């Protein structure tokens, strides 16, 4: 099983040219969770994408947007698991340019 830090690091690196199956496996998610929470599609649809080597860029803009929102929530969750609940203060500090 992957540790939270490894998953978090991978989640920050996800690009549109990554394969759907690779993303799911590297995020250590089940087909059910990834299909439902990541894209709001059935497992059958997810399996079709994976079996036909779909990349994130092959999906509709709406599907990619939903996935990006899911990924953002997932990274926040893992960040809090690793570094604690003061994530809002840290984000505020780094958001000022």
For each predicted feature, which ranges?
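The DNA-recognition helices of helix-turn-helix-type DNA-binding domains
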Residues: 41-42, 52-54, 85
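A short, Lys/Arg-rich alpha-helix, primarily the initiator
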Residues: 2-27
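Short, charged recognition helix plus adjacent turn
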Residues: 7-10, 76-97
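Short alpha-helical DNA-recognition segment
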Residues: 28-48
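DNA major-groove recognition helix of helix-turn-helix/homeodomain DNA-binding modules
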Residues: 1, 5, 33, 59-80
């Amino acid at each position: 099983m992957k540790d939270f830090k490894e998953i978090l690091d991978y989640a920050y690196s996800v690009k549109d040219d990554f394969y759907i199956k690779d993303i799911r496996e590297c995020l250590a998610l089940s087909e059910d969770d990834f299909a439902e929470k990541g894209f709001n599609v059935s497992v059958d649809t997810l399996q079709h994408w994976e079996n036909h080597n779909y990349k994130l860029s092959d999906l509709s803009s709406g599907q990619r947007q939903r996935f990006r929102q899911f990924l953002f929530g997932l990274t926040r969750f893992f960040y809090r698991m690793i570094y604690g609940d003061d994530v809002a203060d840290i984000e505020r500090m780094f958001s000022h340019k």
